[in-house]
A protein has these predicted regions:
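N-terminal beta1-alpha1-beta2 submodule of the flavodoxin-like/Rossmannoid cofactor-binding fold
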Residues: 1-81, 86-97, 101, 105
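Short, glycine-/small-residue-rich phosphate/pyrophosphate-handling segment
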Residues: 109-123
Length: 123
């Protein structure tokens, strides 16, 4: 069975979009899907000095580990994020930075995964 993780950056219309996508996969054979909202996790703002502290102590915060493990254990990723000033949301940028730094190899969280990027934006 293929495990699709749908990552919503926010709890606004993109969270609703994430749940609509999950509903789409509900009756598909061989597919399971789940939705997380990054707003549900207490993720510190990434900065190299903080990363060094965590690595020195061999311990990243629990919520970073939770999100990292969800992403690593998925077969595919769907990212639902609003557009902020012509780019992705800050919370999504932050989680991508943490996942790439909290793994042994920066690619471990994302390699060999199909990804889809979608948005619900009012502008």
């Amino acid at each position: 069975m293929k495990n699709i993780l749908i990552v919503s950056s926010t709890k606004n219309s993109n969270f609703e979009l994430s749940n609509n996508i999950k509903d789409f996969f509900k009756n598909k054979d061989g597919v399971s899907s789940s939705v997380i909202s990054l707003e549900d996790y207490n993720l510190p703002l990434f900065k190299p000095s903080l990363e060094e502290d965590y690595k020195r102590n061999n311990s990243f915060p629990e919520d970073i580990e939770k999100v990292k493990n969800l992403i690593i254990s998925s077969d595919a990723l769907i990212w639902c994020s609003p557009e902020y000033n012509g780019g992705i949301s800050p919370i999504l940028t932050n989680v991508i930075a943490w996942i790439s730094r909290a793994t042994d190899d920066w690619k471990d969280g994302f390699k060999d995964k199909h990804s889809l990027i979608c948005t619900s934006s009012g502008g």
